[in-house]
Amino acid sequence: MARVKGSVATRKRRKRILKLAKGYYGAKHKLFKTAKEQVMNSYYYAFRDRRQKKRDFRKLWIARINAAARMNGLSYSKLMHGLKLADIEVNRKMLADIAIADAAAFTALAEEAKKALAK
């Protein structure tokens, strides 16, 4: 029978993968092969979703701005165009925050947008 000499490195590699797979469901945190596959998938999901998160937040901000704009008699696109014409530079993140936290300030911005659109 051949002599095995890679036990330390093999054990270290397997322990590292199983440690990364801690908390996974079923065999995915117990068996090396399935744990390794799941860890590789997890890295893929993390990479993909770091980019997806940016899209998701932008969608959320736009939905919030649209809801607040419609309460003030404007659509989202008309509000954004009106703000651009009025030279009011405020990003979607801040605008969504204003819409939730300070309705009066958002109404003032909407009125400015309406004035700019009327010109």
Curated annotation (Swiss-Prot):
Question: What is any one of the record's Gene Ontology cellular component terms?
Answer: ribonucleoprotein complex
Q: Some GO term, biological process aspect, for this entry: which one? A: translation
Pfam families in the record, alphabetically? Ribosomal_L20 (PF00453)
Q: Name one GO molecular function term.
A: rRNA binding
**Tagged with keyword Cytoplasm:** no
Give the transmembrane ranges.
Answer: none
UniProt KW keywords? Ribonucleoprotein, Ribosomal protein, RNA-binding, rRNA-binding
Return the similarity comment: Belongs to the bacterial ribosomal protein bL20 family.
Functional summary from the UniProt entry: Binds directly to 23S ribosomal RNA and is necessary for the in vitro assembly process of the 50S ribosomal subunit. It is not involved in the protein synthesizing functions of that subunit.
**What's the protein called, per UniProt?**
Large ribosomal subunit protein bL20
Q: Which gene encodes it?
A: rplT
